[in-house]
Amino acid sequence: MEATSSALSSTANLVKTIVGAGTLAIPYSFKSDGVLVGVILTLLAAVTSGLGLFVLSKCSKTLINPRNSSFFTLCMLTYPTLAPIFDLAMIVQCFGVGLSYLVLIGDLFPGLFGGERNYWIIASAVIIIPLCLVKKLDQLKYSSILGLFALAYISILVFSHFVFELGKGELTNILRNDICWWKIHDFKGLLSTFSIIIFAFTGSMNLFPMINELKDNSMENITFVINNSISLSTALFLIVGLSGYLTFGNETLGNLMLNYDPNSIWIVIGKFCLGSMLILSFPLLFHPLRIAVNNVIIWIEITYGGANPEEDPQVSEYTRASNLRPISMTVEDPAQPSDALDATSYNEQECLLPNGNFDNGSIESQENNNDERGTMAVAGDNEHHAPFVKSRFYWITALLLISMYTLALSVQSFALVLSFVGATGSTSISFTLPGLLGYKLIGLDSLAIGKMIPPKDRFYKRCSLLLVFYGLSVMFLSLYVTVFNRSDEA
C-alpha cells in the first residue's frame, strides 16, 4: 500500500483520535482536583502518553521495514504467546469507546431536533458506515479535520463564555469562594475522576497505521507529529478544563454542556458540533478494532482450527510473523573461506543498515540453487497486520457494526463497563504494552552489531520499564476505585 500521508494529515488524525467527547468531562475532574493538581495531572498524562507513543515509534524502527509496524508484528517479535491478549485489549478498548459514542449520539440529537433516540442512532449509520469501509487511515483525514473544527468551536465557546462572564463581573464570587487554586477540593472525588485525565490522551491504537502511511516516516518526522499532537491536545484539555471549572465552580457537571442555557443558539450549535465530532470520531476507533479482530481470528484458526499455512495465505503470513526474531544473524557456510565470509558478512550488514541505521528484523536462511553459500532473505515485507483476503474485510466490518448498533439500541448505560474498559484497555495499549516492547527492543540494534547500547537508548529503556510499572499502578488503582465506588452505590 502506497504511503501518501503528510505530517499535517497524520497530526489531524492523531489529535482527533486522542481528543473526544471525554474533553467535556475534564472540568468536572478539575472540580475535585483543584486547579494546581488538575494541571499537574494533565501535564503528567501528556508526558506519559507522549512517551508511550515515542517508545512505540522507536520500536517500529527495529523492523527491517518500519512500514510493517503494528502491535501484532512487534508482539510476535517479543512476546508471541501474549500477542492475542494485547489484540483483545485493543478490541475491548476500541469496541467499548465506540459503543459509548453511539449511545451518546442517541442521547444528544433528540434534544436538538426531536425524534426517537433509536432513530438517531440508526441514522448515524448513513455517515459512519461509508467511513468505516475505507482501508487507509489517511483517507479519514478530511473527516478528522471537520471533527477538529467542531472541537475548536466547542473549545472557543467554553473559553469565550468564561471571558464574557468574567468581564461582566459575574464570576467574582465563584473565583473567591468556590475555586480551589492550590489544594485538592475532594480527595475521594480525585480518586474517582483522575482516570478521566489519565486516559484522556489515549491514541496509540492509530499510531502504527499513521507511521506506515507517512510519506516521510523518519524518526524525526514521527516525533514531530507526536509532539504536535500531544501539545495541541494538552492545550485543548487545559483550555476547556480550566475555563469550564472557573466558570461554574462547584456546580460543574460531568458533561459541561449541561451547565449552559439549553435555549441559547450558541449552545445548540455546540451540541450539534459535539454530535458531529462523535460521528466523525467513530471510524478512527473502528479502523484498529477491525485489524485486531482479524488478528485474533487468524490466531484461533492456527491454534484450534488446524489451519494449514501452505493453503491459507493469511495463516502463512501470521505464521511467518510469529517466527520472526528481532536480532539479525549471519549464516556461516563451512565450505566458504573465512575472508570471503567476512566480505559476505559485511555486505549483508550493509543491506541491513540502510542510511547507516540498523533495523532489527528476522533473517531467514534460504538455500540458493545457483550458489553453494547461504544467502540472507529478509522476512518482513508482509502487511503491517495479518492481511484481509477475499471477503473477510467486509464481513468483519458488518459483524462489528451490527453488534455495536444492536447493543447501542438495546442498552442505555455502559458506565460500569466503560470504567473497566478504561482501566484495562487504555492502560494496556497506552502504557504497559509500549513499556514492555520498548524495554525488550530498544538498543537491540546496537547489540546485534557488537556495539554498546548508547546512553540515550539506555535512558529510553529505563523509561520504558517505568512506563510498565506506571501503567500497572494506574490500572490497579482505577479498578480499585471503580469497584469501591460500585460497592458504595450498592
UniProtKB/Swiss-Prot annotation:
Pfam families: Aa_trans (PF01490). Residues 355-374 are annotated as: Disordered. Belongs to the amino acid/polyamine transporter 2 family. Keywords: Amino-acid transport, Membrane, Transmembrane, Transmembrane helix, Transport, Vacuole. Present with 195 molecules/cell in log phase SD medium. It comes from Saccharomyces cerevisiae (strain ATCC 204508 / S288c) (Baker's yeast). The chain crosses the membrane at residues 7-27, 35-55, 85-105, 109-129, 144-164, 191-211, 222-242, 265-285, 398-418, 429-449, 464-484. One of its GO terms (cellular component) is plasma membrane. InterPro entries: AA_transpt_TM (IPR013057). The keyword RNA-binding does not apply. Residues 1-6, 56-84, 130-143, 212-221, 286-397, 450-463 are cytoplasmic. It is found in: Vacuole membrane. This is Vacuolar amino acid transporter 7. Residues 28-34, 106-108, 165-190, 243-264, 419-428, 485-490 are vacuolar. GO terms for biological process: amino acid transmembrane transport; amino acid transport; regulation of sporulation. Residues 357-368 have a biased composition (Polar residues). Probable amino acid transporter of unknown specificity. GO terms for molecular function: amino acid transmembrane transporter activity; L-arginine transmembrane transporter activity; L-glutamate transmembrane transporter activity; L-histidine transmembrane transporter activity; L-lysine transmembrane transporter activity; L-serine transmembrane transporter activity; L-tyrosine transmembrane transporter activity. It is a multi-pass membrane protein.
